[in-house]
Amino acid sequence: MAEVSAREQIIFDLASMEWELFQLVHNTGGRASCQDDPDTFFKMRMSQWVVYSDSVLKSCMEDFQEAAAQGRNLIFEKYGRMMETTHPEEYERVRQYFPEISEQHRENVEKITAIHLEWDKKTAEAYPYLRKNGRLATTREDSADGISMESYLRGELQCFSEKTVELILKETEEAVKDGVNLQERMIENEVRFYGYESLERAEEAHRSREGEEA
């Protein structure tokens, strides 16, 4: 059996911590189906974490640990913040539990989110069938039936510390300069978890499947 590296361990530990906290989140509409699907959850979360540096991973872990020491659940806060656009009335009832964030923090979150939106457009153009199976793209598409990639990312980033968000912004902007699409990298990691050799192979499989169902 191959030895697990320190980097692989922290990625797994982050996903594990998120999963445990996710189990403590109570949805007003009842338990969500994804709360009973650890396989999909771990594949999706680890696919995201792996694109970031060790510095970001360690900073995120520190955020989770510090929040836990304060009796806070960052996953509850993440999904709670998302409700601002999907369930505004419920959001008003829970927003008091979320720490205030500075204007600079908010601006940094929006910078990262804007870049991911551009990356998402490019990914959708290159892999339309594959992208069609993901979340909605923009906040204006949010409803009680679903949350967009934009709102999900915003809600998640708002929960992390200013230090963590600054690190993520730095790496996001560096990726732009290097011509790297981190949003696409995340999806590529995910399809590999499902056995596809590449995004191209996954796209072809989804195209064929849709053709068979038509």
Go through each PLM region and give its residues.
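Short amphipathic alpha-helical segments that mediate assembly, nucleic-acid/protein binding
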Residues: 7-8, 42, 54-57, 105-108, ...
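Short, structured interface segments
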Residues: 79-82, 86-87
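Alpha-helical oligomerization segments
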Residues: 163-214
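Basic/polar N-terminal segments that are highly enriched at the extreme N-terminus
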Residues: 1-2, 214
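A cross-kingdom feature marking solvent-exposed beta-strand/loop segments within repeated
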Residues: 28-51, 58-63, 74-76, 141, ...
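Short, structured motif recognition centered on aromatic/hydrophobic residues
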Residues: 49-65, 109-113, 157-160, 164-172
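Polar/charged low-complexity regulatory segments
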Residues: 2-36, 86-89, 96-143, 176, ...
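Extended intrinsically disordered, low-complexity coil regions enriched in Ser, Thr, Gly, Ala
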Residues: 56-58, 62-80, 164, 173-188
